[in-house]
C-alpha cells in the first residue's frame, strides 16, 4: 500500500474497476446486463471522480426492484475475469492516449499536477499505461474488499419513490444482516494546495494554445463553496459571464472560455480556461486575470 499511496493508484483502481464491473458478474454476462436494462427501457452507467465512484440506473418506478438487483449484482458479484481485464486494459490505455491527443482535456490534468504536486489529487484518474497494465484480478479484488464496504456506501434515489418499498429492497440487497464497519483511513491525508506560482506546459503540434489558470478555492464541506459557485457563474460559468462576454463576444479571441470550481475533502481550487490562437495566448491570459481581479 505504500507504493499505492506514493503513486496515487487509488484513483486508477477505481477507474479500472468501474470498467470491469460491466463485463459480467457471477449471475449475468455482459450482454445480459446490457440486454436486461435495455429491456426495461432504462439507462445503466457509472463514473469515477477523484474521491468516489458512482454506479447508477434510471428506470420507471415500476422497475425499481430490478434496477436495485442489477446494481447489487455489479458491485457485489463482479466476475473480474483475466481475459476481460486484459481487453479492458487496452481500452483504458486507448482512453489515456485519447486524452493525450486532446489538449483541451490535457491542460486540466496539467493544472492539477501543478496545483497538487506529489499528492494523489495531482494524478490523472485514468493513470498511466504502465500502472494500468500492472493490474491483476487479485489486486482489483483486494481493493474492492477494502473499499466496497457497507460503511462507505451512499445511496441516493430521486423521482417517484416509495420509501416503504425502497428501504426493504436496499436492506435485502446490501445489508444482509451485516453491520456497517467504519470506513478505513484514506490512502493519503487531505492534500493542500502548493504555495507560490507554478507553470506547467506541454508542447503539441496543434493550432491553438490551451490555457488554464488556477487559484485557491474551498473544500466541499465549507459554506464558502456556495459563494464560489455564485462567483463562478458571474465570472465564467454562463453565456452572460464576464469571461464569455469580454473575451469571446466583444474581442473574438476565443471560442471556448469559462471558469469552474473544483472542490475535494479538505482542499479545492478555482480555475479559468481559454483556448485561443497561439500568438494570442499571452494576451488572453492577461485578459482572464484582469476579469478575475475585477470581481474583487
Please report, for each region that a protein language model flagged, where it lies by residue:
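Charge-rich, well-structured scaffold segments of protease-associated domains
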Residues: 30-184, 190, 201, 218-219, ...
Amino acid at each position: 500500500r505504500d507504493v499505492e499511496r506514493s503513486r496515487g493508484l487509488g484513483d486508477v483502481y477505481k477507474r479500472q474497476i468501474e470498467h470491469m464491473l460491466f463485463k459480467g458478474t457471477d449471475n449475468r454476462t455482459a450482454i445480459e446486463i446490457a440486454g436486461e436494462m435495455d429491456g426495461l427501457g432504462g439507462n445503466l452507467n457509472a463514473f469515477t471522480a477523484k474521491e468516489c465512484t458512482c454506479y447508477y440506473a434510471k428506470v420507471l418506478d415500476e422497475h425499481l426492484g430490478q434496477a436495485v438487483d442489477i446494481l447489487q449484482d455489479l458491485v457485489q458479484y463482479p466476475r473480474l475475469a483475466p481475459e476481460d481485464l486484459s481487453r479492458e486494459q487496452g481500452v483504458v490505455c486507448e482512453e489515456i492516449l485519447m486524452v493525450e491527443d486532446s489538449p483541451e482535456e490535457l491542460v486540466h490534468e496539467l493544472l492539477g499536477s501543478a496545483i497538487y504536486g506529489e499528492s494523489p489529487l495531482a494524478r490523472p484518474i485514468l493513470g498511466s499505461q504502465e500502472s494500468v497494465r500492472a493490474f491483476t484480478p487479485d489486486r482489483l479484488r483486494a481493493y474492492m474488499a477494502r473499499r466496497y464496504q457497507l460503511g462507505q456506501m451512499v445511496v441516493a434515489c430521486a423521482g417517484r419513490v416509495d420509501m416503504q418499498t425502497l428501504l426493504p429492497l436496499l436492506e435485502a440487497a446490501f445489508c444482509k444482516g451485516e453491520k456497517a464497519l467504519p470506513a478505513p483511513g484514506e490512502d493519503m491525508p487531505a492534500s493542500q494546495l502548493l504555495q507560490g506560482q507554478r507553470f506547467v506546459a506541454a508542447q503539441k503540434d496543434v493550432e491553438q494554445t490551451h490555457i488554464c489558470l488556477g487559484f485557491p478555492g474551498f473544500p466541499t464541506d465549507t459554506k464558502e463553496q456556495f459563494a464560489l459557485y455564485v462567483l463562478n457563474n458571474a465570472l465564467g460559468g454562463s453565456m452572460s459571464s464576464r469571461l464569455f462576454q469580454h473575451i469571446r463576444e466583444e474581442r473574438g479571441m476565443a471560442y471556448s472560455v469559462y471558469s469552474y470550481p473544483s472542490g475535494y475533502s479538505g482542499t479545492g481550487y478555482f480555475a479559468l480556461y481559454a483556448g485561443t490562437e497561439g500568438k494570442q495566448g499571452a494576451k488572453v491570459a492577461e485578459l482572464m486575470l484582469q476579469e478575475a481581479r475585477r470581481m474583487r
